[in-house]
Regions:
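Class I S-adenosyl-L-methionine
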Residues: 12-31, 37-144, 150-153
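Conserved S-adenosyl-L-methionine
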Residues: 99-188, 193-194, 233, 241-243, ...
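Conserved Class I SAM-dependent methyltransferase catalytic core
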Residues: 214-276, 281-289
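A short glycine-rich beta-alpha junction/loop motif
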Residues: 288, 487-495, 526-552
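Non-catalytic DNA-recognition/assembly elements of restriction-modification systems
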Residues: 349-424, 545-570
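Specificity-determining recognition surfaces
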Residues: 364, 375, 381, 514-541
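Sequence-specific dsDNA recognition surfaces
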Residues: 413-423, 436-464
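A short beta-sheet element
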Residues: 464, 470-513
Length: 570
């Protein structure tokens, strides 16, 4: 490579780095500058918005300040709606005297949904917040929210993005369920969680999923509302916590059964953990795409596991994340702009290939020569709990299970005493307690507690040769109880397994080190924040009997000695 080309590339990379710095830190720098100039917080907001709207703002501050802020804003190269969202998230809670960041959906997710909607149709967001989910849609838009102060922001954004919408300040759950107006599309990122409940019987009795109940999660009711707002063949895009998709408690299963029995589930796109970190929540979420059309007895459901959405989700303020080359340079488009590191664009292509092949109506797609391979599963693949969590339908899991079944492997259930109960009555004066922190796989070091101070998670009374396996998503920690100790108790953060005999103990132990065990374990965890594996599901994990028995038996013997020494030292 010539020196001139190398120099040119270096200059481009330096320009990109400066552009990224501006895009990421522009508001912090503006805010600090205005603070140093003695400008009050609300006035700072008015100055920035005034400049963006090209309104005269010199009555609020000096010309020098205005010109400095203008110059800084001129260096920003991100979409207008993204700038508005960043500004509102930064200042909104001060300007409107209310915490508002709960209402924001990452723009790349909004753009993904908008890119699938056919222009010129009707669309509604019944829990709109600031209306981000339909920020780019060109059609007949209806936005509804019961928070009047939030709708001030919504109106502002829609007016200045040139995106007209009819906006209503209503309680959607109460006012829309009986509406005769129906829509081609409903988009939804509802309030969710066990703390967002309604006990209003007037609302509950309007819903199949609330009828006769004393309380119900608002998010569940919004799903039913969203479905009932659809025209025939209309489509719902619902961003929901993964707990809604995998929890086996009655209300969640009932919601999923309503979807499966009365509608057609087109697709499920799993979003990365912390996708909503910018809004201060670590809830794991997915996008459900559901069509108001009578379901077939069996059909294919599109799935995709999106790992990145264009933001660095583990950093404060979730700055943009860009694609890098192997040598550490930024990947650029033809205009030398850095390319966001996001997989939603590819997910769209895969889904459009799916809807084209399946001849699904009412969604936007383009025919191309490429034939990308998508993943899907059959409606008939679901068990009685109707799990929507896609991890157990992805190819990596299905291929692992296929190998296990082909080699006639048995499940963990076949090697353990399934009728064992680990529950106990707290009658002893003190207990030795094993929690996740006291396990350093495969060793453990219990802590001694008096009866009254035993942690509430201490639910399992264990004995020699019992196996404890962490229920949590992530690195699997485990240990083997190697001693006969009275009053030894384990946290219910573990799955407790009691092998049938010593041979079963060695076989189970050997399998804990295999990739197949890890894939099955991590594919079956469910939940929204702390994803865990149920005690029933772990017993359905396949394990192989063809192991090096003598090798793992010797390892177990060594662990017994090490644990004895560790506990003695402790």
């Amino acid at each position: 490579m010539s020196i001139s080309i190398l120099s040119s590339n270096q200059e481009i990379q330096q320009q990109i780095q400066e552009k990224i710095k501006n895009n990421t830190k522009f508001l912090d720098e503006i805010n600090q500058y205005l603070h140093n100039k003695g400008v009050e917080l609300v006035k700072r907001y008015n100055i920035i918005i005034g400049i963006l709207l090209k309104k005269e703002t010199t009555d609020l501050s000096s010309v020098e300040i205005i010109e400095w802020v203008k110059a800084k804003l001129s260096t920003i190269s991100i979409e207008k709606n993204e700038i508005y969202q960043i500004i509102f998230m930064f200042f909104g809670n001060h300007y409107f005297k209310k915490q508002l960041d709960q209402f924001y959906t990452p723009m790349t997710i909004c753009n993904f949904i908008n890119s699938l909607l056919i222009p010129g149709k009707t669309a509604i967001d019944p829990a709109c917040g600031t209306g981000d989910l339909l920020n780019q849609y060109q059609g007949d838009i209806t936005l509804v929210d019961k928070c009047a102060s939030v709708l001030e922001m919504t109106k502002f954004i829609k007016e200045h993005l040139g995106n007209n919408a009819t906006i209503y300040n209503k309680d959607s759950l109460k006012d829309l369920i009986t509406s005769t107006l129906k829509y081609d599309y409903c988009v939804l990122n509802p309030p969710f969680g066990t703390k967002t409940l309604t006990t209003d019987t007037d609302i509950l009795n309007l819903y199949e999923l609330g009828l006769g109940k004393k309380k119900q999660e608002i998010g569940i009711l919004f799903v039913e509302l969203g479905l009932k707002l659809l025209k025939p063949k209309g489509i719902l895009f619902a961003i929901l916590p993964n707990g809604y998709l995998g929890n086996t408690k009655g209300d969640y299963v009932a919601m999923r059964r309503m979807i499966i029995d009365k509608y057609t589930l087109l697709g499920i796109i799993k979003l990365p953990d912390n996708a909503f970190a910018r809004s201060g929540t670590g809830v794991a979420t997915s996008i459900l795409i559901i069509q108001n059309i009578k379901p077939k007895k069996n059909y294919s459901i599109f799935i995709e596991d999106v790992k990145t959405i264009g933001y660095t989700l583990n950093k404060k303020n979730t700055p943009f994340k860009y694609k890098m080359t192997p040598d550490g340079s930024y990947q650029c488009d033809k205009d030398s702009n850095p390319i966001l590191d996001e997989e939603l664009t590819n997910a769209k292509k895969l889904f459009q290939r799916f809807i084209s092949k399946k001849k699904i109506s009412n969604l936007l797609f383009t025919n191309t020569l490429s034939r990308p391979t998508y993943q899907s599963f059959k409606k008939s693949d679901m068990d009685l709990n109707l799990i929507f969590d896609i991890k157990r339908y992805l190819n990596i899991y299905k291929n692992t299970i296929k190998v296990c079944k082909t080699s006639n492997q048995k499940t963990l259930r076949d090697y353990c005493n399934t009728d064992t109960t680990f529950k106990f009555q707290k009658t002893a004066s003190q207990y030795y307690y094993i929690d996740i922190k006291s396990v350093n796989t495969p060793l453990y070091n219990p802590n001694l507690y008096p009866n009254v101070l035993l942690p509430s998670r201490g639910k399992y009374k264990v004995e020699k040769n019992d196996i404890l396996i962490s229920k949590l998503k992530g690195k699997i920690s485990f240990t083997i109880i190697t001693e006969d100790k009275e009053n030894l108790v384990a946290s219910n953060g573990f799955s407790a397994i009691r092998p049938k005999d010593e041979k079963s103990l060695v076989i189970i132990f050997a399998n804990l080190f295999t990739e197949a065990f890890k894939i099955q374990h991590q594919s079956m965890v469910t939940g929204s924040i702390m994803e865990t594996l149920s005690d029933d599901d772990i017993k359905n994990i396949y394990i192989k009997e063809d192991i090096d028995y003598d090798k793992y038996n010797a390892i177990l013997a060594s662990i017994t000695i090490l644990n004895r020494e560790l506990i003695t030292l402790g």
